[in-house]
């Protein structure tokens, strides 16, 4: 598999995403899947009502609540592995910092539909969202653990505001709902071993179905104002740092938090 950094950088700048097919081998995915499934089963047990009624994702997979020391170290080593960091550097060349992890799965509720959104809409009103997409953005690095229907993205919306159709659907105005199809949407089917990189603030939705279970690693530019969103518990304990081959991604976040 040949990865062309300059092509991927240019594509991301223009479109707001890119996919590298078969980036991880079977052994890497099997090892990651084992740890993540351990977290997922414990999380489901602990959040039964929420899981049954509405959940489609969880977060803080690297936290201390569900995984023991050694499994957390395995996750931190995957997140900061040469393969991941090489791609991180394509989109955040200087001082990338770790924000969090999320796990995306199918909702139990069969009436629940996938929906269009920009991540920034959960923190900002409309005018602030317009500003957010012109500034430094958080980047998702999605690793599907099983073959899945993938994502639907609106290319280029990391750098432009919604058109009329997109806005009405995303905001559920004038009779539209956020699960309606968009004429500008592009479906990206994913398989175990693929890596999807996309801007958190582009218009996107996950596609429910198949055995959907995808680990998202969220990374931000240290120059951005995001450190307040980082939960201390998702970072490695000091005693873990010498067991992580390349802890720079986490140390950058720790340094930012110490200055906050």
Which stretches of residues belong to each language-model region?
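Double-stranded beta-helix
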Residues: 134, 138, 144-203
């Amino acid at each position: 598999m040949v990865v062309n950094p300059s092509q991927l950088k240019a594509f991301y700048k223009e479109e707001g995403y890119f996919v590298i097919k078969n980036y991880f081998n079977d052994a890497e995915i099997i090892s990651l899947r084992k740890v993540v499934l351990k977290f997922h089963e414990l999380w489901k047990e602990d959040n039964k009502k929420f899981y049954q009624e509405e959940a489609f994702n969880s977060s803080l997979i690297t936290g201390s609540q569900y995984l023991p020391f050694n499994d957390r170290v395995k996750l931190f080593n995957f997140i900061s592995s040469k393969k991941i960091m090489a791609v991180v550097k394509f989109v955040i060349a200087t001082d990338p910092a770790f924000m969090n992890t999320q796990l995306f799965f199918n909702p139990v509720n069969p009436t629940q539909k996938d929906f269009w959104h920009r991540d920034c809409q959960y923190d900002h009103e409309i005018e602030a969202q317009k500003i957010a997409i012109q500034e430094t953005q958080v980047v998702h690095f999605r690793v599907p653990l099983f073959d899945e229907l993938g994502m639907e993205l609106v290319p280029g919306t990391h750098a432009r505001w919604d058109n009329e159709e997109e806005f009405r659907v995303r905001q559920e105005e004038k009779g539209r709902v956020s699960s309606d199809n968009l004429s500008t949407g592009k479906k990206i089917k994913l398989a175990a071993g693929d890596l999807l990189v996309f801007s958190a603030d582009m218009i996107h939705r996950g596609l429910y179905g198949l055995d959907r279970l995808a680990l998202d690693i969220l990374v931000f530019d240290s120059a951005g104002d995001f450190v307040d969103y980082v939960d201390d518990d998702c970072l490695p304990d000091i005693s873990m740092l010498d067991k992580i081959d390349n802890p720079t991604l986490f140390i950058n976040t720790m340094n930012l938090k110490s200055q906050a």
